[in-house]
């Protein structure tokens, strides 16, 4: 009987070791999908920035049947003529002026995900306003499907 308990204890220890190893690897693989940025980063060599990012998002969203979340109708051109008159009396040397500036954190933004890092197609699609049925749990083929898999199906 004690031999059986010893084997059972050994098997449980091996199983626990295996589960802990798998759990630690899962944590590492999930962390690869999280992007973080700071103000000192340079754009990724294969990142999408500026006008290129805008064009890709526009084309992707329209091909998926959705709209961009950041709509141009909410953008307003600012009137800067009167600003110059108010600031005319304030003069700073370059060093003093730059001392008031700090680098912006771009964490969690489309710029962080796609310009400073290399983003994937499903990360780009998160910035589209997609139809409700797009991320349904059951696809047209009847199999269980996540939004990522359905997105890949749409481009296949």
Curated annotation (Swiss-Prot):
GO terms for molecular function: hormone activity. The keyword Disulfide bond applies. Disulfide bonds join 37-114, 49-119, 61-128, 112-115. Belongs to the insulin family. Residues 1-31 form the signal peptide. It comes from the Eukaryota. It is found in: Secreted. Residues 79-93, 96-102, 141-156, 144-156 form a propeptide. Involved in glucose metabolism. It comes from Aplysia californica (California sea hare). This is Insulin. The modification 4-carboxyglutamate is found at residue 152. Keywords: Cleavage on pair of basic residues, Disulfide bond, Gamma-carboxyglutamic acid, Neuropeptide, Secreted, Signal. Expressed in the central region of the cerebral ganglia mostly within the F and C clusters. InterPro entries: Insulin-like, Insulin-like_sf.
């Amino acid at each position: 009987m004690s031999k059986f308990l010893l084997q059972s204890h050994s098997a449980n220890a091996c199983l626990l070791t295996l589960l802990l190893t798998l759990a630690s690897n899962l944590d590492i693989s999930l962390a690869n999908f999280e992007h973080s940025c700071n103000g000192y980063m340079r754009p990724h060599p294969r990142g999408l920035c500026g006008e290129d990012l805008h064009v890709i998002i526009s084309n992707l969203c329209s091909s998926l049947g959705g709209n961009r979340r950041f709509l141009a109708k909410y953008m307003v051109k600012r009137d800067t003529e009167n600003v110059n008159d108010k600031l005319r009396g304030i003069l700073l040397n370059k060093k003093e002026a730059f001392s008031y500036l700090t680098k912006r954190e771009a964490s969690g933004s489309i710029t962080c995900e796609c310009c400073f890092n290399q983003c994937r197609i499903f990360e780009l699609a998160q910035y589209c306003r997609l139809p409700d049925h797009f991320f349904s749990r059951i696809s047209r083929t009847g199999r269980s499907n996540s939004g990522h898999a359905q997105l890949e199906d749409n481009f296949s």
